[in-house]
């Protein structure tokens, strides 16, 4: 019994630590045997416990592992204690899926349904696709294959098959490791070693080839502004004070610069509201543009155009956009791109955050929210955007804009490659969960798009991580971010980002190949079990 428990505990420790921002070693080891140790322990426990109890053990194991992975959600300073309920529901949902899948793997081995094991990696991709595409706005964080991205070679494997391919390989390798423990066949061992090495060999060969041909002959000169204010600090300041702080940061920018990027919802009031007076802001305006004449009242657009004129560049800034539709006021989370000539291009966030930006469940969901969680009942309706966010930064350079956690969804960002974006730009605010792991977790998930699509990215975040990353996933520049050991900091990251890009399989085909495999796997598994049901049940192991 001690040996069985030690297997389960060891697997728990490995998988808990298997996060690219926590441990690279644990991430690599977990990809090849972390889950197989759990299944080996459950396999032996079936002889002593009922299937119901085995499922409960798998559920508790997964719930606690996911609890560690999503521990950043428990920073309730700004979001309130109601987040514990959301956290618990999310963990229970994920634990139900993986506990059921784990019992299916063990059951197939107990029944000697070895042929079914071939279909199970694809079945898992189908299960994970449900939460990736179907749960509210989608849960893109912490997919099974994420630990594979802890190394440059593992991330580069994503340029072929994306998140689904990474999850498929991790599950396949662990099933083979489980089979090696049970069958001790040389074929199983050889297949396991092949699956373990395959993503690193393929990704590594591609990575080294691209690194050899990498060129920085064409660059984009960017200035990324990190204001360093949390939601609490933002609420305690006037809009004019916020602008004075932003202009003060911009004073450190050296020309020439092609684009200045500010974070998500950097200032209140939207683009066109006349919320500022000349009397209150005249000293700052004169320091920005000494010879420009201003009216008595002016807008956020006037501020942005002044910065664009001062630095002779494009300015991208996140802010809210209000629109009256049929007498009902709607709110968009928007990015405004203003060229140095004054041309305005807007992008509205398409993937909204459940609870924070909309209440799931329509009128019923809103009614329940008002009853049980009145602090989360939104006084207005937020709408998702309908169009992609490719904008012109210069005459020759295009950027694909995303806001907040949109950048973690490959299917949402992939069209930017087809629309000939040269660089990805993300505006975000991770300050809602202060002193947590979220800034790094979000950053590591978002930068996967670089190698999936073969283009660089820049991201501006209020409290970090603000960074520039090239198309091979290498960090070109980064500012300090808020964590338990590092306080909130302000700054401007000014760097030249190489625009070297390359074609990828994922950019061309997306998730379609693996989703097709997933559908075929589900059909194949059902057909296999149906056929076996008609046969005499075989004897179990031992």
Swiss-Prot record:
Active site feature: 264 (proton acceptor), 349, 404 (nucleophile)
Entry similarity comment: Belongs to the CN hydrolase family. Apolipoprotein N-acyltransferase subfamily.
Membrane topology category: Multi-pass membrane protein
Subcellular locations according to the entry: Cell inner membrane
Pfam families in alphabetical order: CN_hydrolase (PF00795), LNT_N (PF20154)
Biological role: Catalyzes the phospholipid dependent N-acylation of the N-terminal cysteine of apolipoprotein, the last step in lipoprotein maturation.
CN hydrolase domain location: 220-499
SUPFAM superfamilies with a match to the protein in the record: Carbon-nitrogen hydrolase
Bilayer-spanning residue ranges: 24-44, 54-74, 85-105, 116-136, 160-180, 190-210, 509-529
UniProt pathway: Protein modification; lipoprotein biosynthesis (N-acyl transfer)
Protein name per UniProt: Apolipoprotein N-acyltransferase
Keyword annotations from UniProtKB, A to Z: Acyltransferase, Cell inner membrane, Cell membrane, Membrane, Transferase, Transmembrane, Transmembrane helix
Keyword DNA repair attributed: no
Enzyme nomenclature, EC number: 2.3.1.269
UniProt record, GO biological process: lipoprotein biosynthetic process; putrescine biosynthetic process from arginine
């Amino acid at each position: 019994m001690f040996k069985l428990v030690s297997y389960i505990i060891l697997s728990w420790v490995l998988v808990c630590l298997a996060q690219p921002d926590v441990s690279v070693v644990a991430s690599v080891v977990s990809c090849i045997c972390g889950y197989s140790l759990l299944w080996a322990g459950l396999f032996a426990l079936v002889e002593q416990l009922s299937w119901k109890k085995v499922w409960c053990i798998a559920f508790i194991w997964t719930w606690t592992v996911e609890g560690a992975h999503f521990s950043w959600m428990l920073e309730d300073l700004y979001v309130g204690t109601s987040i514990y309920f959301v956290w618990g529901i999310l963990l229970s949902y994920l634990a139900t899926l993986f506990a059921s899948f784990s019992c299916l793997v063990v059951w197939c081995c107990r029944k000697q349904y070895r042929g079914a094991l071939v279909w199970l990696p694809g079945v898992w991709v189908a299960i994970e696709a449900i939460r990736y595409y179907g749960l509210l706005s989608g849960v893109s964080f912490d997919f099974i294959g994420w630990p594979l991205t802890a190394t440059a070679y593992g991330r580069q494997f994503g340029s072929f098959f994306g998140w689904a391919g990474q999850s498929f390989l991790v599950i396949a390798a662990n099933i083979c490791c489980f089979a090696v423990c049970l069958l001790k066949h040389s074929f199983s061992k050889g297949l396991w070693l092949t699956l373990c090495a395959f993503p690193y060999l393929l990704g590594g060969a591609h990575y080294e080839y691209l690194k050899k041909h990498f060129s920085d002959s064409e660059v984009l000169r960017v200035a990324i502004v990190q204001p360093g204010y949390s939601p609490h600090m933002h609420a305690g300041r006037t809009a004019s004070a916020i602008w004075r702080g932003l202009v003060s940061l911009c004073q450190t920018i050296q020309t020439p610069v092609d684009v200045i990027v500010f974070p998500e919802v950097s200032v209140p009031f939207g683009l066109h509201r006349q919320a500022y007076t000349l009397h209150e802001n005249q000293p700052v305006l004169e320091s920005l543009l000494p010879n420009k004449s201003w009216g008595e009242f002016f807008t956020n657009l006037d501020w942005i155009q002044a910065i664009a004129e001062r630095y002779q560049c494009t300015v991208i800034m996140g802010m809210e956009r209000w629109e009256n539709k049929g007498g009902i006021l709607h709110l968009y989370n928007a990015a405004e791109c203003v060229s140095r000539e004054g041309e305005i291009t807007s992008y509205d966030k398409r993937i909204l955050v459940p609870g924070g930006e909309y209440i799931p469940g329509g009128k019923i969901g809103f009614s329940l929210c008002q009853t049980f969680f009145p602090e989360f009942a939104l006084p207005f309706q937020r709408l998702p955007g309908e169009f992609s966010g490719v904008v012109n930064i210069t005459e020759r350079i295009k950027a694909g804009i995303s806001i907040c956690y949109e950048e973690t969804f490959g299917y949402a960002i992939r069209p930017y490659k087809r629309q000939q974006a040269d660089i990805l730009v993300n505006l975000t605010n991770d300050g809602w969960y202060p002193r947590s792991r979220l800034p790094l977790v979000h950053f590591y998930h978002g930068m996967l798009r670089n190698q999936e699509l073969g283009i660089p990215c820049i991201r501006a975040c209020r409290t970090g991580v603000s960074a520039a990353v090239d198309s091979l996933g290498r960090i070109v520049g980064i500012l300090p971010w808020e964590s338990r050991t590092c306080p909130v900091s302000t700054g401007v990251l000014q760097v030249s980002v190489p625009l070297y890009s390359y074609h990828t399989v994922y950019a061309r085909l997306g998730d379609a190949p693996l989703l097709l495999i997933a559908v075929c796997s589900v059909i194949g598994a059902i057909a296999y079990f149906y056929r076996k049901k008609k046969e005499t049940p075989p004897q179990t192991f031992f």
